[in-house]
Regions:
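Catalytic cores of RNA-modifying enzymes
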Residues: 1-228, 232, 263, 274, ...
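C-terminal lobe and adjacent flexible extensions of AdoMet/dcAdoMet transferase-like proteins
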Residues: 212, 231-291
Length: 291
């Protein structure tokens, strides 16, 4: 491996690279490049990357964080959807021989196969500065597809990071909170203001670390059923749980069966989905499974 040092993350160097390639930001890809070395260091520290690690980076942009990851990890695979960035990445990463750039949509990449080839199927670490519009599908895809993951350390919209770690009874609590907390332990490790990016986003961001559980914190017989119940509960969050589930095509149970399942769990017929904990949703799914 080369002895090169990461040099991107400095606004001046970033502008030089963009001008050299006459790069135009693509709004449809939600591109905001990091230009703050302190934040980059914080992400690398929070991800707890060592020389034994294989790291998957989603959305490397011009390779700013990739340079830092390549310094810290054994090997990095960086998946970039924007074809116009590939020649830039080949240039900015030429001094690191432990980086593979993959020009593809992360939702179409077989990450399990990648982990098998690059890491003998052992758990990988995921690091990303995610476009806001696609945060949820990417995170849920990583969790639901049974990819072997140790942790996910990501930059997301502050509001999304908050939603991932809140509990019942708060306005931000929802299906994403429950899904993340079923698979991982979430921890916000840094708040990042808009001036740390180019171009500046309109909202604040946060770095959140999701440490994958070896086993989920609750026992549930049918995961898919539990998540269908959760989605139905929050699709009409102002309705009672009975009405929310009764009106949902995802939950094939009658009003009587719904009331019976709630009774088995000792839950009020007037309760709303937003009041239930993950454990209570698991109990409810198990009650439905036993009907």
């Amino acid at each position: 491996m080369s002895m090169a040092r990461p040099y991107l993350g400095d606004p001046k160097r970033t502008i030089e690279v963009l001008q050299k390639y006459n790069f135009a930001f693509q709004k449809r890809f939600g591109q905001n490049f990091l230009i703050d070395t302190h934040v980059l260091d914080k992400i690398i520290d929070s991800a707890q990357i060592t020389k034994d690690d294989f790291v998957l980076e989603i959305g490397p942009g011009i390779g700013t964080m990739t340079q830092y990851l390549a310094e810290a990890a054994r090997e990095v695979a960086a998946v970039e959807i924007d074809t116009t960035l590939i020649p830039i990445l080949q240039d900015t990463l030429k001094d690191w021989d432990n980086v593979t750039v993959i020009n593809n949509d992360i939702l179409k990449v077989d990450i399990r196969q990648l982990a098998l080839e690059k890491n003998q199927g052992r758990p990988i670490k995921v690091v990303a500065n995610l476009p806001y519009y696609i945060t949820t599908p990417i995170i849920m895809g990583l969790f639901e597809n049974q990819v072997p993951i140790d942790s996910i350390t990501i930059m997301v919209q502050k509001e999304v990071a908050d939603r991932m770690q809140v509990g019942p009874g708060t306005k931000d609590y929802g299906a994403l909170s429950l899904a993340v907390q079923y698979y991982a332990k979430p921890q916000i490790v840094a708040n990042v203001p808009p001036n740390c990016f180019m171009p500046r986003p309109k909202v604040g961001s946060a770095v959140i670390r999701l440490e994958r559980y070896a086993e989920p914190p609750v026992e549930v017989k049918d995961e898919k059923l539990m998540f269908r119940i959760i989605r139905a509960s929050f699709n009409q969050r102002r309705k009672t749980l009975v009405n929310g589930l009764k009106n949902s095509p995802e939950v094939p149970f009658s009003k009587e069966q719904i009331e019976e399942a709630l009774g088995m769990c000792g839950l009020s017929l007037n309760i709303r989905g937003e009041a239930l904990t993950l454990e209570q949703f698991a109990q409810l799914a198990n009650a439905f499974s036993s009907l």
